[in-house]
Each structure stands twice: as C-alpha cells, then as structure tokens.
Amino acid sequence: MKEKYGSAELRRDYNQVCGIILREERQKRNISRDNLASGLLSGAALGKIESGKAGWRMLMGTILLQRMGLIPENFEMVASSDELERWRKREDICLLIPDRPSEAERRIQEYRRSYTMREPGEEQFLFKAEFILRLTEKGDGQGIGAAEDLLLLAGKAVSCTIAGDWEKEMESLLLAPAEMEAILLVGAAEMLCGRKSKAKSLQQAVWKYPEAHQWKDRAAAGILPQAALLGMTLAMEEGESRLAYEQGRKALELLRRSFRHSYLLPLLKMLEKIPRQELDEEERAYLKQAETFRDTFERIYRQYDYPGERIWQGISVENIGEAGVILKMLRKFSGKSKAKAVYDGEDQVVTVRQLEKIESGVHKPSFENYQRLIRQYGKQAGWTTAMLETDSAEVLELRQEIASLVALCQWDQVKWELEKLRRKVNPEYPRVKQELLFLEALLVWKKNGDLGKSLEMLQEALKITAPGLDGGDKKWWVYQREETIIAGNITEILRKLGRPEKTREWLEILQFSLKQQKGQTGIERRAYDILMEAYDNYLGDMKQFEQAIKASEEAACNYLKRPEALVLDKAYYRIAWNAYEMAEEVPSQRNALKQKWREAFRISEVLAAFMYDEYIINFLKERRKKYLF
C-alpha cells in the first residue's frame, strides 16, 4: 500500500478493507474459500464478505479470523443488539461454571428456549458448557455423566463446526480456539474411558497446532493453557513430572507475556500438583514463584467475588459496538431529530418508526442502510473496521505490539517500532495519519517532556477522525478506541498543565460516552483504562482520596472481566498511593489505611512481576521503603 491515493479513495468502505485482509491472509496460506468457511457459511457467502458486499455476524466473523490465527482485537466491529444480548447471556453462563452448576444448567436451558435459531458457534458453546457441567457434577465421569455419554456430548460439540473425519485431518483443518477446546473435551472423555493413548494423541494435536500454523503468541494464548491442563493431567497420571512441568511452564509463560488471566488459576493449581523430585533448583524456584502468583490472584478474585476458575467464550466485546446505540449517539451528537436522521442527503433510507426500532435494538439495519445512515455524521461505515487502513495483518500486529510497548512505558522501543510502522503504511489514510501523529505526540511528552507541544499534536490527531467535534454535543460522540485513547491523554496533559476545569469537562465527556457504548454487555470499552488513570490522578489532585480508591477498585474489578489484565498492576498501585495520601489527611484512619496500602502495594509488585512489567517493577522498587517499612 505504498502508492498515492486521492480523497475519493480515502473515503472507501472500511469493511472492504477487512475483507481484503481476510482474502490476502487466506490466499497467502493457500486456503480455499470453502475450506475457511467450512461449517460456518458457504464459500460464496464468504466471497461476498471478502469483496465488501456483505457484512458478517460477530460470532461467525470472530471464528473466521481466529481460524487463520488473526486477532479480532485488531478490528473494531459493529453488532446488533440481539448478538450482544446473546453474548451477555453466554457470558453469564461462563461465570456460573463450575461453581454454580444448577444455575448454569438453568441458564443453558433458558438460552436454548429463547433462541431456537442458533449459529454453529453458539451450539458448540452450549454443548461444551454442558460437558463441563456433567464432568464437574460427577468428577470421575460416572453415573449420569458416564464417560461414554461425555464422549458423545463432546463429539456433538466438535461436529457443530467441523465436518468429516476430523481426527484424521487435524493437521489440515482450519480451527479457532473455541473449536480446539471441543477437541480437547473429546480427549478428556477418551481419558475417562481409559483410552489414554488416544487422549494424548488429541491433546498433542491441539498443543502443536498453533506453532504448526505459525500463530503469534497472542493467538496461541487462546488455546495452549487449556491444552496444557489436559496434557499435564495425562503426564502426571503416567508419572511424567517433567513433561507436565514443561507444558505447564510454556502455557504460563504464554499467559504472562500476553498479559492474560484466562484459565490462569486452574493452570497455577495444576502446577502445584507436580512432584518436585525430578526438577532442578531453578525449576523448583519457578514453581515457588507460581505459588505466589496463585496466592495473589486468589486474593484478587476473592476481593471482587470473581470466579477465578470460570470458563471463557474466547470472544471479547471491548472493541464491538451496538449498531442502534451508535446511530442514536451520533444523531444526538449532531442535534438531529429522528425525522431528519432518516435521510441520506435527499433520499430517505428508513422510516422514522424503523429508526426508532433500530435505535432501541429491536431491529438491525441492513448492511447497506447502516452504511448510508452513519455516513451523514462523517463516520466510515462497515460491520468491521481495521484499526488502521491496511491490507496487511502484519501491520495490524505491529500496531498492537507498539500499543503493548506504550502500556509498558518502553519508549525507546516504541520509537524504534514506530519507524518500522511508518515504512509499512500510507500516511494519507486518516487512521494511519492519526496513529502516527498520536505516537509522535506521546514521544514528545514522555521522552522530551514538552507537554504543550504534545497537547497540540494530540488535539490535531483527534480532529483527523472527528473534525466536527466542536460543532456538536461532545459527550454523545461515539469515541472509537483510538479516539478514546487520544482524548484520555489530552485529559491527562490538561491536568498536568494545571487546568482542572477543562480536565473535569473531558472526564465527564468520556465517562458518559463510554457508559453509553458499554450497553448491555457490561464490559468496558477498550481504552477505559486510559480514562480511569486520568480520573484517578484528577481525584488525587483534588484530594478526594476516598473517591479515588473506590474508582480504582471499580476499575480493577472491570479489568478482571477481560481476558487481558495488563493494567491491573497500575490500578493496585493507585489504590496504595491514595490510601497512603488519605492517611496523611485523616490520621484517625491511619491503621486501617496502612493495611490497605501495604496489601495493595504488595499485590501490585506481584502483578508487575507476573506480566514482566519492568517499568512498574523498577518504579515500585524505588517506593518500597515508603509503603512497606
């Protein structure tokens, strides 16, 4: 994408770009449309998605991306109210398993009754959930949950999206993590049936799959921990302690370097069961550290009454917006009545009644109508939008790597990777131009300390995709992921420049907008952490320490709802800082607050070590004496 483009081409449909990425990655791997689409949709339907002529449903689209090792979080998606409602109900089931089996079983049956028309991925999820329930109810697989019955149930889960003699074709199949989980359940059932050799063969097929298909670590982290749990069980039953250790350590390191806590607690508990006799001193020390991680995460989960051994869907919604909510917010931002908002120029797109139903979530607009309705507000349309205008998944991965480096405050590496990104993209595209300017502004701030210049650059970057922001009601603007990050950094610089009124104005704007976008999922949008850090700092400036502690504890609780927990260590440090400062203001509460700040500080230390967050590790070392002695 190195040639020049005109303004008309810059306004091209972003959904087409995502289709191009899908097609390019498919062709690069020499995969036919029929093979990629197998079990989900027809090859012809996939062709329409690749050409940008059709959109996709959230669940199906996620599986398509994951089958090629692509990370859905590199895209922003739009879904219907129905899709997000279904996601929420599946998430509620996940939170109940394995601790509350009766309630989980009731919710599963409710789901089946409520949604008689289900996608293959939904049906697969329900079968997997039922399998785990039966397994946990009868731990040895006997009685109602007899091993052969479990095997039949696991087979049904696999066949929802995988056709044919899949056991003989594993190497050539295109599989998403959710599909491989179903195969692992078949392996678990075979183990319970006494066929350990077959169970091991299936476990190894899944264990080796990500590397064989050249998946990046972030993609592999979605399945290797689950594979390790079965592999470690099999290995220890056969007395192979070292094999169990090696698989467990590899899976744990993958979670640590991906900043994830999904399936972390079961993995840590399994590591504790490994006999130490065959391990050397370094390996035993590693397991000792793993025990510290287990203690800390159990403490965190108890603090927020969060089910640490829950199951996960493998589908995140932090980057997914609801079509009706987006249209409603943009209409309110522009001050348009419903009667005016139904027009695309001179042409009426939908009736007022239809728009009301769309905004309320009763109806989802057609792909074409959604495009026409949203463009009147200056937004690019599409069910799926790449984080940058590129036809390269490699570029999107590089952008995500830079985002992780920013979160870890590795500014020299950010600068290096930014130059690499610059050589791979076309700066004429709005999102690319915005990303480059945003990263440059961060470096001006973090490396040069020039707050004023950085503020100007950030404000300019925000205007690239939100040029009419000053002309509408800002709190109703649909701040997309990068816009929220930029606006959050603007807020923090305004605070540092001593402009509290402007800081509070931006905080209220972003809090309102993100609350609307959260909708019925209950999951905060990506970049929520940027907002909460700025909010905490503002409350500290105002000496509202008790409110700041509550805000950081609320943020920590929300971070646990995501598979990734990258900023959890920073949230706990903020709790420690605010408790310490509050004790200075309220000496009568010092003893209780001292206990709070010491515990929060220690948790922050362990979390920073868990995630290899060197910046926070060193930051905390410098302050250890203050908080712990």
Model-identified regions with their sequence ranges:
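Short alpha-helical DNA-recognition segment
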Residues: 27-48, 332-357
